[in-house]
């Protein structure tokens, strides 16, 4: 991970900007170990962003502060730490998995609704859950409901126990 510390994401590039142009602009801030302009796999045209990796993290920080918002080949560029940018993206994905937690809560209330014979109550819980669950949570919830409802939930619990028991036997 230490090798990515001096790596900068450079976005908003002109499609005409190449590695040499980026290196020329950024090299005044310090020793550069790598410059990559990301290209489309089929057309080999620039996709409008790239990465500049500095040998020294302090040089990278100086370059980021100085170059963010500046113009290169007629386009205003955005410069950010490469690691920070991908952290934000992965945090977004993890946030999407909150739908899984929503399903678990929905599963419990559905069980309660089922034992009282209140199918509508379970459905209402689903609607409330989808509102609080946020993105994609409702889709997961309804897809899971359609795959067997409470019985599916219980039987998967049984199969988990079965596989656990067989695992324990093999272990001894």
Curated annotation (Swiss-Prot):
Localization (cell): Nucleus, Nucleoplasm; Cytoplasm
Post-translational modifications reported in the UniProt record: Methylated on arginine residues. Methylation of the RGG motifs is a prerequisite for recruitment into SGs. Phosphorylated by CK2, GSK3A and GSK3B. Phosphorylation by GSK3B increases RNA-binding activity to the TXN 3'-UTR transcript upon exposure to UV radiation.
Tissue spec. comment: Ubiquitous.
GO cellular component, one term: nucleoplasm
Assigned keywords, A-Z: Activator, Cytoplasm, Methylation, Nucleus, Phosphoprotein, Repressor, RNA-binding, Stress response
Induction comment from the UniProt entry of this chain: Up-regulated upon mild cold-shock and hypoxia.
Record text about domains: Both the RRM domain and the arginine, glycine (RGG) rich domain are necessary for binding to the TXN 3'-untranslated region. Both the RRM domain and the arginine, glycine (RGG) rich domain (RGG repeats) are necessary for optimal recruitment into SGs upon cellular stress. The C-terminal domain containing RGG repeats is necessary for translational repression.
PTM sites of type Phosphoserine: 130, 138, 146, 156, 159, 163
An annotated GO BP: negative regulation of cell growth
Principal localisation: nucleus
Comp. bias intervals (Gly residues): 93-105, 114-137
General function of this protein: Cold-inducible mRNA binding protein that plays a protective role in the genotoxic stress response by stabilizing transcripts of genes involved in cell survival. Promotes assembly of stress granules (SGs), when overexpressed. Seems to play an essential role in cold-induced suppression of cell proliferation. Acts as a translational repressor. Acts as a translational activator. Binds specifically to the 3'-untranslated regions (3'-UTRs) of stress-responsive transcripts RPA2 and TXN.
SUPFAM superfamilies attached to this UniProt entry: RNA-binding domain, RBD
Region (Disordered): 70-172
Effect seen on changing residue 105 to K: Inhibits stress granules localization and translational repression
Top-level lineage group: Eukaryota
Residues of the RRM domain: 6-84
InterPro entries reported in the protein's UniProt record: Nucleotide-bd_a/b_plait_sf, RBD_domain_sf, RBM, RBM3/CIRBP_RRM, RRM_dom, RRM_dom_euk
Consequence of changing residue 110 to K: Inhibits translational repression
GO MF entry, a single one: mRNA 3'-UTR binding
Binding partners and assembly: Interacts with EIF4G1. Associates with ribosomes.
Pfam family, one: RRM_1
Name this polypeptide is given: Cold-inducible RNA-binding protein
Bias (Low complexity) ranges: 138-172
